[in-house]
Amino acid sequence: MSATLRNLRDFPRALTWSALTSGLLIVLISCTGPVAMVLQAARVGHFNQNQTASWLWACWVGSGVFGLLLSLRYRIPIIGAWSTPSVALLITGLADHSLAEAVSAYLVSAALIILVGITGIFQKLLDLVPRPVIMAMLAGVLFDFGVELFRQLPTDPAIVIAMLLAYFIARRFGWRAPVVSSLLIGLLVAFLLDEVKTPHLSWSLANPVFVSPEFSISSMLTLALPLTLLTLTTQYAPGMAVLTNSGYPTPTNTALIFGGALSFLGSPFLGSGVNSAAITAAIGAGPEAEPDASRRYTAGVVCGLTYILIGLMGATMVGLFGTLPSALLAALAGLGLLPAIGSSTHDSLSDPQYREAAMVTLLLTVSGMHPLSLGAPFWGLLAGVATHLIAKRIRA
């Protein structure tokens, strides 16, 4: 506690313009693709506006508390987030499961992550399932977002093409957040084409909605198990690796326990989980945020505080995004996930030893099949592991 208070007292002196802008940039990125994905998942799950606002409230506030307190405690730029791969999984899962079943999956997944942190078996658990198989499942889960980006071309070609051009031009010039430029150009084109609805906004605090869980074997296997694996492998593992590569000691077990506890508390209010950031972690941890490594924690504090403030206005956020054309939201989600789709596909297929197992997992996950009411990600994971074990035995 003394270290936390000391770092809090040092915050005004340690904060620099570069750390401030890095923290705000992380928030801006999270306001683009990830929020668009939540809104898509909410549509699939037939959430009303209050339920969607509650989901955003739980995600934003939980992520903010995670990053704020851990950054202050360890003087490390730890960035909180919700798992975008997990939200992508929910978009397929909510079509086959009730809201109450999804909440039960959130609770079980959070409890499992807490258990992993308490026991310290994080790395051992990651070694049980081959990483290429998990990456193939992730690529399969995200695949439809990339496809949907181009499905929107006939519907609204001007917006989609403008956003694509903005994204790749920004990438070409090395901008840190190309998806933000896509959003700005997409908004400009939508305004020019008069496709933005007139907002009827009321600035009010979010009103969290409580949902009682309903446990089922199907939701445990199709949602809870993949959610846990995706969160550990695509959020905590790369997020902690970013901190290690930046020269910081990584409080992995503490982060797992704290993130799992926040996820557990937010689950009944439709929060899909809180964890360390992966994609945006490098923005706060690198020298671009602040040359002095001992001051970079302020980027995590700024990000956490801003997350909390935005989360409290969850209903307003839903109203703002509700004014935008569906093509813009779909393009935003797809563009935001392009790097993740590319890297997960590459990681799954680059090692010849695991390539066949990864292909089985990828194709099965993309297929969308759900025999026995169990979703395609579960069957893809199961088939991929089985294929790997059979191939390993044959080689032996």
Question: Where are the predicted features?
Answer:
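Residue-level signal for transmembrane alpha-helical positions in Major Facilitator Superfamily
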Residues: 32-33, 158, 234, 276, ...
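Membrane-interface helix-boundary motifs at transmembrane edges
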Residues: 171-176, 247-248, 290-292
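Membrane-embedded alpha-helical modules
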Residues: 95-201, 302-396
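Helix-loop-helix junctions within the multi-pass membrane cores of secondary transporters/permeases
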Residues: 2-13, 19-38, 57-138, 250-338
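Tryptophan-centered motif/residue detector
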Residues: 55-57, 82, 153, 167, ...
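Short polybasic/polar patches that bind polyanions
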Residues: 43, 127, 244, 267, ...
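Helix-loop-helix hairpins and the membrane-proximal interhelical loops
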Residues: 1-53, 179-253
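Buried hydrophobic packing segments
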Residues: 89-90, 166, 185, 242, ...
